[in-house]
Swiss-Prot record:
The gene is coaA. InterPro entries: P-loop_NTPase, PanK, PRK/URK. It comes from Bradyrhizobium sp. (strain ORS 278). The keyword Transmembrane helix does not apply. This is Pantothenate kinase. Gene3D superfamilies: P-loop containing nucleotide triphosphate hydrolases. Its EC number is 2.7.1.33. Belongs to the prokaryotic pantothenate kinase family. It catalyses: (R)-pantothenate + ATP = (R)-4'-phosphopantothenate + ADP + H(+). It is an enzyme of class 2 (transferase). ATP binds at residues 96-103. Keywords: ATP-binding, Coenzyme A biosynthesis, Cytoplasm, Kinase, Nucleotide-binding, Transferase. It is found in: Cytoplasm.
Amino acid sequence: MDMRTTEQQYNPYRVFTRQQWAELRNDTPMTLEPGEFSKLRSMHDRLDLQEVEEIYLPLSRLLSMYVDAAQRLYYAQRQFLGIRDRKMPYIIGVAGSVSVGKSTTARVLQALLTRWSPRPKVDLITTDGFLYPNAVLERQGLMQKKGFPESYDLPRLLAFLSDIKAGRHPVRAPVYSHLSYDIVPNQWTEIDQPDILIVEGVNVLQTGPLPRDGKAVPVVSDFFDFSVYIDAEEAVLRRWYVKRFLSLRDTAFHDPRSYFNRYALLSDEEATATAIAIWERTNLANLEDNILPTRPRATLILKKGADHEIETVALRRL
């Protein structure tokens, strides 16, 4: 038997080249203006008309079908059970490594989905707000593992998602500041009955150990209806991270309020060495141990090349 045929037969994903995926756009209209691209794009990420047309419009079309099917199934179940539950929002998870461009993908999806007809309410949160405050991380010796699963207040995040799925409103999420690198005290983002909620974070597809007694232990992805994993080779991610670090050294790090202000006066050589050290000590370990192993759990995998362009799309078979 041809090994390639065997691998394809048992592959849980259908894999598309960029050209093949672009053809699935069909007649989905472009609803974004060119001037919006720079506002949606993260630092050094790629987002232009071609990327939206060839990657995100087909994805928007697919998601519209998934959301419609989920709504019909929900109403069928409600009719079968003879109950009148509150309407549940459709939740989309966006996962991937640091510096891969999760925020760009999440913002583009929010912008496109908001423009569907009729206009749904689409909210976006990041799991950064559910990190433990720095004081807690320092007390527990976890500052060097910030972003690892153990650095998140998982019970709080699960309670938040449970309330969202149950239709409770409004539901509050803590606010995180990338400037201070910490939770902002007494500030909240309110999520009030969205039709669609996008949840973005490095570890949103993470699972925990299964209990031996068989009791149900919820994980974040249990609340997702659809999930996207943004993928790239480790060497590429490392290069993007170093490039972003150098750019921040020249911009945000100069703010006296910045947690990383101490890096603002580093030379190019010093900044590069510092970025590589941080990558290898923290981000690479998190990628290899906690993030990359969750990739097979995604509904859709977007694989990027060295120029940030999405090269292949893998869609999980039904």
